[in-house]
Each structure stands twice: as structure tokens, then as C-alpha cells.
Amino acid sequence: NKGVSILDPVLAELMTLWFTQKGFKCFDIFAGDTVFGYVTATLGNVFTGIELRQEQCDLNNKRCKDLAANYICDDALNIDTHIKDNSKDFFFTCPPYADLEVYSDLDNDLSNMEHDEFFSVYQTAMGKVYKKLKDNRFAVVVVSEVRNDKGEYISLVPKTIDIMQQSGFTYYNEIILVNAVGTLAF
């Protein structure tokens, strides 16, 4: 994985089992690897993922060719082009943690941006998610804190909560995933 973390498939499975019903239409605007799309489609849902990197999209679509999972190569900011309002049942994402892991050298890759620009783009993209979900549906955002060059938290967790609430979501729950020491990418 070239030093980039991979989403925990058990976490993807649990979130799918807890927050969806078979046949739900799920989506992710920072799709990244194949894990969530593969898991949720294997469990009987339809998945749409937006992923910035063409090579990752191609790989994901190849891995999911026999499943109801489709990855679109585009910027998360263009969510309105690909997903209609009030059309989805579940949103799941594990967005870039600012510059903690660098995914590509693309100019519009959030992992290449200074923190102020990251939060501006992140807020715009995430702010569009609420309108895509049908009423009484859930969103799961997997985030953790990131430190700046001075060792201070950049407030990714509280800013994500604020962004989601400002766009219309109710802060329903918080789940803490405890990782074993030494499992994160270096």
C-alpha cells in the first residue's frame, strides 16, 4: 500500500450492517481504496464512489466488476454532477486526514493542500452530502486528529462535526475505534 493506510474491512462491514438495509444506495465522495464499496456491495447494497485518482478508480472498478459498485473518477467537489439530491440511503467516508498521508501529486488532492485550503475545500465538498441523502438516513465519517508542524491538533474532528451539523445533519453518535499500536502508516 506504499505507506498509505487501508480502511478496516470489519469497520466497513459493521457500519453497513448497523446503518443500512439490503438494497440501500450508498456513496462516498472520498472513495480511496476498494474496501467500503466492495464490502457494502457484497452485503447487497448499491455503491457509488467518487475518487480523484484515475488509476485507483480503474483498480476499484476491476476489483468490483461483479458487484453493484461503481467508482467515478472526479473531484469530490463535483458531487452534484454524479449524485442527485435525495437519492441515497447511506453516506460513508474516510476522507483524507489533511496532509497526514499524501495520496498523489494532483493539485486538487486534499492531501497536498495547506491546512487552510484543505478545510475550505473539505467544507465545500462535505457540505453537499446532506442534500444527497433521503430523509431519516445516516452518514458515517471516519476521522482522527492530525497534528501540524508545531505538534498541535488541527481540529479535524470538531471541524468535521461542525461542517456536518451546519449542512443539516444531527450529531447522533460517536464511535471510537481503538487501533493496536503500530498499525498506522508511517
Stretch-by-stretch model annotation:
Residues 1-186:
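Class I S-adenosyl-L-methionine-dependent methyltransferase catalytic core
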